[in-house]
């Protein structure tokens, strides 16, 4: 479960970087690479709205996934600590001298 969520987190991160870089900035951003200012059927405002909404959705998914990953990893760590403590208690109770 943790591995799947980690893969999803990395994928969301990469998509978020791509969407942010595609947004139009003062210098044009990566969206101006084509050099064609006439976008045909799709207007620049429509593309800007789509990229803005995509950024908001991906950011929300990123934050939710980060919280879930943090919660799961803290539970996993506490389980590991309790198991180590149990093993140490069992070893001290059942320890016998090696040689007499």
UniProtKB/Swiss-Prot annotation:
Entries under PANTHER family matching the protein: PROTEIN-EXPORT MEMBRANE PROTEIN SECG (PTHR34182:SF1)
Residue intervals passing through the bilayer: 1-21, 54-74
Gene name of this polypeptide: secG
Protein name per the record: Protein-export membrane protein SecG
Family: Belongs to the SecG family.
Coiled coil: none
Keywords: Cell membrane, Membrane, Protein transport, Translocation, Transmembrane, Transmembrane helix, Transport
Function: Involved in protein export. Participates in an early event of protein translocation.
Compartments reported by the entry: Cell membrane
One Gene Ontology CC term in the entry: plasma membrane
Top-level lineage group: Bacteria
InterPro entries: SecG (IPR004692)
GO biological process: intracellular protein transmembrane transport; protein secretion; protein transport by the Sec complex
Gene Ontology MF, one: protein-transporting ATPase activity
Pfam family, one: SecG
Topology of this chain in the membrane: Multi-pass membrane protein
